[in-house]
UniProtKB/Swiss-Prot annotation:
Modified residues (Phosphoserine): S108, S148, S192, S250, S334, S348, S492, S495, S512, S514, S515, S516, S518
Domain notes: The PDZ 2 and 3 domains seem to be involved in the interaction with SLC26A3. Interaction with the C-terminus of CFTR could be mediated through independent binding of 1, 3 and 4 domains.
GN (gene name): Pdzk1
Main location: membrane
Composition bias, Basic and acidic residues: 484-507
Domain PDZ: 9-90, 128-215, 243-323, 378-458
Matches recorded under PANTHER family: NA(+)_H(+) EXCHANGE REGULATORY COFACTOR NHE-RF3-RELATED, PDZ DOMAIN CONTAINING PROTEIN
Annotated PROSITE patterns: PDZ (PS50106)
Record bears the keyword Secreted: no
Keywords, alphabetical: Cell membrane, Membrane, Phosphoprotein, Repeat
Topology within the bilayer: Peripheral membrane protein
Protein name: Na(+)/H(+) exchange regulatory cofactor NHE-RF3
Function: A scaffold protein that connects plasma membrane proteins and regulatory components, regulating their surface expression in epithelial cells apical domains. May be involved in the coordination of a diverse range of regulatory processes for ion transport and second messenger cascades. In complex with NHERF1, may cluster proteins that are functionally dependent in a mutual fashion and modulate the trafficking and the activity of the associated membrane proteins. May play a role in the cellular mechanisms associated with multidrug resistance through its interaction with ABCC2 and PDZK1IP1.
Amino acid sequence: MASTFNPRECKLSKKEGQNYGFFLRIEKDTDGHLVRVIEEGSPAEKAGLLDGDRVLRINGVFVDKEEHAQVVDLVRKSGNSVTLLVLDGDSYEKAVKHQVDLKELDQSPREPALNEKKPDLGMNGGVETCAQPRLCYLVKEGNSFGFSLKTIQGKKGVFLTDITPQGVAMKAGVLADDHLIEVNGENVENASHEEVVEKVTKSGSRIMFLLVDKETARCHSEQKTPFKRETASLKLLPHQPRVVVIKKGSNGYGFYLRAGPEQKGQIIKDIEPGSPAEAAGLKNNDLVVAVNGESVEALDHDGVVEMIRNGGDQTTLLVLDKEADRIYSLARFSPLLYCQSQELPNGSVKEAPAPISAPLEAPGSATTEDVGDHKPKLCRLIKEDDSYGFHLNAIRGQPGSFVKEVQQGGPADKAGLENEDIIIEVNGENVQDEPYDRVVERIKSSGEHVTLLVCGKVAYSYFQAKKIPILSSLADPLVAGPDAKGETEHDSAESTKDSSHPARDRTLSAASHSSSNSEDTVM
């Protein structure tokens, strides 16, 4: 029965600030997410969308049974291009009536017709260049990673399917029908479905996948070339190695190097305030992986010290914090591969931004010195006298909230919050597009302490202009204080949600309950 239904793949592209030119809606007594009111000459019309079409998949993710608000959100967050798999209205209603599994429609790649040419994408000297495999790091939320595993008759390997919209897998960069190459650094290309399921189950709450999308898998299959793990893209990993270039001062570099009793290798300790090490971005408990471009993982303490001394008045260190070390160890990848994939400017600290729900290229025009001058801030506030010591303000009818009237000496002031700081995250959840009341509710429900990711106006404008997502990984990590209740230096709230939103003009009005154009709450 399923073979009698023919969904259509419609690829829509629009310019910045333009609409796709159609309405996506639900209607009473009508199943599915409907396409309506297609504008003449719009991207929707050009892509072949028809009135009454039902949307089955968005960018490969099955959405027919999802909440309508989530489906709309997926389209909006796709940027300036989106791929929709749709079924015409009559066929959809027949499929529902006959209880056809809509997930199974158009699951296998369509073969080109005899008179149809394959697209010449990624061609280099007449040979198609296959895209990179990619590492995806998943941390379970609740009891689910947000995907299912499947095998396809006649195809070798195990594939990922049923990707939950805005779930763990999607946020980590997993795509529908991805071919699974490795689980936690172990190749599973020849493993059975049951063996892969067992490996995933035994992984616990954290797992690392090496994946290729279906087009990349097809490319390698046609060229009969194996996947090379050393070519994998690392940009989706939430914590990355850092390259730190330090120039020696009059009193040396300003840090101690120690062999870690609990952590392997040589660990950075006791960084002196105001020292060259602190200024260069070195952190306590960083693990040293390479010195001046050479791996030191196999050297003892004296050997690493000697290499640093041999650098003269300047040394370059490749370091990992504890979480980055944990991630790369799980993947069984050398951090040196990260260096090989980066173009590092001289005399800078390179910190890669964390991923969002889809791969993002770092803007080529932004130098690391620029980013270092425009950092968001992680602020952990401990309530005093039932107050956080600041007002929250917003422009009525517009998304986004910002800080006003920070009380001197209050919790907000102590945590580093400043007037007109823009709220990006509350306890790791991105709130840039949330209504004012919802942000207030999140902060109030936090109890005695709350962690905010905020950005000053100048830094916010910089990130928006450069199209750099504002993520907590760009901020300096929180340091555990006497009231931190056992949290470690690296226990900071991380968000994988897309926060690359267009800059919004704001009139930063004074906090007032009676203002006609703003909303304000004492926190």
